[in-house]
Amino acid sequence: MRKFLSLAVMCSLALPAMAFAQPESPKVAADDLEDMPEVEVETTTTEKSVTVEEETTTLVVEGEDGAPDTMVTVVEEKTTVVEEVEETHPFLDGLTWMVMASAFYRIDGYVGEGVRAGEYNTLGYPYTQYNGFGLNFVGGMAQYTGEKFGVTIDLRWGTGASLLTPLVPVKQGYVTYMPNDNISIDFGFFDTIFGGEVADEWANANYTRGALYFLRQPFNHMGIRSAFAFNDKAGFTLMVTNGGVLGGSPIDNNETPTIGWQFALTGEIEAVGFYFGGQHGAGGDNDNKNWENFFDWVLTANAGIFTLVANGDYQISPNGGNNVDGNTDRPFSYGHSLQLIFDASDKFSIGLRGEHLSGNENFRNYVSSGDTGLATATITLRYKPVEYLVLSLEGRGEWNTREIYFARNGPTAMDPDTMEEILLPSQKKNYSAILGFTAFIGN
């Protein structure tokens, strides 16, 4: 969630406060527990076994006044009870943890122009945004859930960390209050509830995240998130956060907070889920009006070995000041994605994804930084040789209406600030191959 198993609520309407996510996987090592305050150890005694033994003793009683001696047999029972003492640690029962690492090798190029090192596009996405070897993320998560409260710490380092969070290495950090079983309230910095993909790629259809994920959706939010479970099939989440509709603002940059919300519905057997929500906030820095509006929907469906995830996003921005041609339409952008996962076996799976992003004329001409008409197609073959290890082979194609991709022998220009020669984008399409290596483990 971030995303797909926003699926925090996605699969079971588990409260997003203590879900995850993402997927969330594994959790903390013994070293992390050494500095924790000493907690009282509870002990319970259980009866393991009972053994009964009989001992027979023969006694001779001398007769009186010439009477004969009498033989007396005495039977004595001995009962032995073997007990087992079990120690329990109630504090540790509420602790979950995860550690992970994700590395890759990426290559693309153009016939006659070779492979260019470094970033391959001008939009700054995805996490695998350059050719060669890379380490997207390495990090982990620790979460403690008590009877009425919880605390979550989620950290990430790596070349992709700065794209994921403005608080590197903090991916998430929040406290949770749970007044009852149906309500949870989070305070702090947390993953978004929107979208059909999450930051942890093993929970997605593909190794790379899509253009919709990067260009049309928030990653995280700073503020308050409240989740309400109406029943086991319907829930509602409400957020009040910093920044604009795309989130990610540790320090507020306008005068009014942003309001976010999401309804979550699941089917009778949870094979189908539908999630619809939005964000509404001031459109500029130090602003309290000109509100932007963002809407997101996700549909999930599962049929045995097949899983389908469809996602759509729409953003209406305040009217820009650059529409010199007299076009007064408010900039409107949109994007859609469709993912299909085929689990051939416990070890092999295939993931497919198709996307299209664009907007109205005012968005394409005055707001967009290059995603004026962007389509992507991705296929991922996955193999899990052992538990918690995922190997991915991925092919990805991208097509744009403008030249946003670099070629090694492309045109150059002089940077007026540094007076250095810089490479200019010269291609409208890009094809790449990616090898992904991911390991994650926890409780």
Where are these regions (language model features)?
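Residues that define the transmembrane beta-barrel architecture of outer-membrane proteins
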Residues: 131-136, 166-171, 218-222, 255-259, ...
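Transmembrane beta-strand segments of Gram-negative outer membrane beta-barrel proteins
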Residues: 88-119, 185, 431
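Transmembrane beta-barrel strands of outer-membrane/channel proteins
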Residues: 99-107, 153-157, 187-189, 238-242, ...
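Residues on the lipid-exposed face of transmembrane beta-strands in outer-membrane beta-barrel proteins
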Residues: 99, 135, 140-144, 172-177, ...
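Repeated loop/turn-to-beta-strand initiation elements of outer-membrane beta-barrel proteins
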Residues: 95, 148-151, 182-185, 232-238, ...
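Detector for outer-membrane/organellar transmembrane beta-barrel domains
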Residues: 254-256, 261-375
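Outer-membrane beta-barrel "beta-signal"
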Residues: 383-385, 390, 425-443
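Surface-exposed coil loops of outer-membrane beta-barrel proteins
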Residues: 109-132, 160-172, 177-268, 273-282, ...
